[in-house]
Design a protein with these regions (language model features):
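Bacterial Sec-dependent N-terminal signal peptides
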Residues: 1-24
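Carbohydrate-active catalytic/glycan-binding domains of CAZyme proteins
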Residues: 22-354
Length: 354
C-alpha cells in the first residue's frame, strides 16, 4: 500500500531503566532518527529488547542502506535504553547458493528470548527464501550463548505439519477436511470468509505445515514460551506452545481471531490478564491497531477497543507494533516501527508509554 509522509508527532517521555545505578532523566523522541554510538540510526527493526544482566539488549532486522539484500540481524546494547552501542550483526545471511539463509533471503520480526533452563538465548524469526517473495512463510530458529551473538542458525520450518489445533473436536476436524480450495475461487465473499474460519486454509497447508509470517514470542510466568504468528495467508493468528528448549513445537496450538486478518502481534500480561496488540494488513502502510484480552494465553481472546487515543489513532501514530517492553517498575512501553519502504534502514522507531 502507499504510505504518506506526515509530520512527526513529538511525544517525549521519561524512562526508568533496567539498571538502578542510572537515575538521570532520559528522554526519548519517537519518530526522529535515533543515533547509536557511531552516530548512525539504529538499524534494528521489527525486533525486541530483553533485560540481559542489567542492561538492555535490542535485536532487530538490519536493512541494507542502499536497498540491496538485507545483511541479517543486529544487536545493540544500552545501560539506559536511550544511548545504544552497536554490537554488529549477530545473525548474518550467507553467500552460499542454495542455503536457506542465502543472501537475498528475508528475515523479519526477529525475537530473542532467554531460556532459563538451558542458559541459551534463542532467536525466532519470520523467514522468507531468496527469490520466492513471501511464499515460504517459515519460522526460523537460531541459538547463542549471549544476547550479542553470534547466533548459530538451526533451521527453518513450517509449524505443525499434520497437526490440528488443540481445542478442535472431531466435528471441527471433519468439517475442515471437507473444505476444498477449488470450491472457493473468489476471496472475500461471505462464504469464503466462513470457510476460512472453519479451516479452509488450515486444511490446505495441513500436510506441509502452517504458514508463519509476522510473529512474536511470549514467555509466561511459568517459563513456558509461546510462538504467536500470522498464519493461513495472514488471515488467522496461531498461538503455539514451544518445547522446553524453545527450539521446536510441542504440537499444542490454538487459532485466534480466524479470518480476522491480524499482523504484527505484541503481547503483555498485567494483573493476571493477557493483552495483545495487533495491526491489520495493509502492506507497509500503517493502520489502526487492534487490542484483544484473555485470561489464558491460549484464549479464548476477546477484542477490545483500540488502545490508542489522540489524532493519529486510525494509523496508530503512523506505526506498526513490534513488541511491548516491560520495565522493572511495572511500566510498559509500546515499541513500533514507522516503515519507510523507500529506505527501510532509516525507518523510525516509535516508543509510546502505555
Amino acid at each position: 500500500g502507499q504510505m504518506y509522509r506526515i509530520s512527526t508527532i513529538c511525544i517525549a517521555f521519561m524512562l526508568c531503566t533496567f539498571n538502578s545505578a542510572y537515575s538521570q532523566e532520559l528522554t526519548i523522541h519517537p519518530g526522529q532518527l535515533w543515533l547509536d554510538n557511531n552516530g548512525k540510526h539504529i538499524n534494528a527493526h521489527g525486533g525486541n529488547i530483553i533485560n540481559a544482566d542489567g542492561h538492555g539488549d535490542w535485536d532487530g532486522e538490519t536493512r541494507s542502506e542502499d536497498g540491496g539484500p538485507m545483511p541479517g540481524v543486529s544487536a545493540y546494547k544500552s545501560d539506559d535504553l536511550v544511548n545504544w552501542t552497536n554490537c554488529g550483526l549477530v545473525l548474518e545471511v550467507l553467500d552460499q547458493p542454495g542455503h536457506t539463509l542465502e543472501r537475498g533471503c528475508v528475515i523479519e520480526r526477529p525475537k530473542v528470548v532467554y531460556n532459563k533452563k538451558t542458559g541459551k538465548y534463542v532467536m525466532i524469526f519470520h523467514h522468507e527464501l531468496k527469490d520466492k517473495g513471501y511464499d515460504a512463510a517459515m519460522a526460523g530458529f537460531a541459538i547463542s550463548d549471549t544476547p550479542e551473538g553470534p547466533f548459530r542458525y538451526i533451521r527453518s520450518l513450517r509449524p505443525h505439519a499434520g497437526v490440528w489445533p488443540a481445542d478442535w473436536t472431531e466435528v471441527d476436524i471433519n468439517a475442515a477436511k471437507a473444505l476444498k480450495m477449488e470450491d472457493y475461487k473468489e476471496w472475500w465473499t461471505p462464504e469464503w470468509t466462513e470457510a476460512v474460519k472453519k479451516g479452509l486454509l488450515l486444511n490446505r497447508d495441513f500436510d506441509g505445515g502452517q504458514m508463519s509470517r509476522d510473529m512474536t514470542v511470549y514467555i509466561d510466568d511459568d517459563g513456558k514460551a509461546y510462538h504467536i504468528f500470522s498464519s493461513e495467508d495472514n488471515l488467522t493468528l496461531h498461538i503455539a506452545e514451544l518445547t522446553d528448549d524453545f527450539l521446536d513445537y510441542t504440537g499444542k496450538y490454538v487459532r485466534m481471531a480466524p479470518a480476522g486478518h491480524n499482523e504484527a502481534p505484541a503481547v503483555m500480561k498485567r494483573n493476571g490478564k493477557y493483552w495483545m496488540i495487533t495491526s491489520g494488513c495493509t502492506g507497509w502502510a500503517p493502520n489502526e491497531a487492534r487490542m484483544f484480552w484473555a485470561d489464558s494465553i491460549l484464549g479464548p481472546w476477546t477484542q477490545a477497543p483500540t488502545p490508542f487515543k489522540g489524532d493519529k489513532v486510525d494509523t496508530s501514530f503512523d506505526s506498526q507494533s513490534t513488541y511491548i517492553l516491560e520495565l522493572p517498575n511495572g511500566q510498559f512501553i509500546f515499541m513500533a516501527d514507522r516503515w519507510q519502504p523507500w529506505q527501510l534502514a532509516l525507518s523510525p522507531h516509535i516508543w509510546l508509554p502505555m
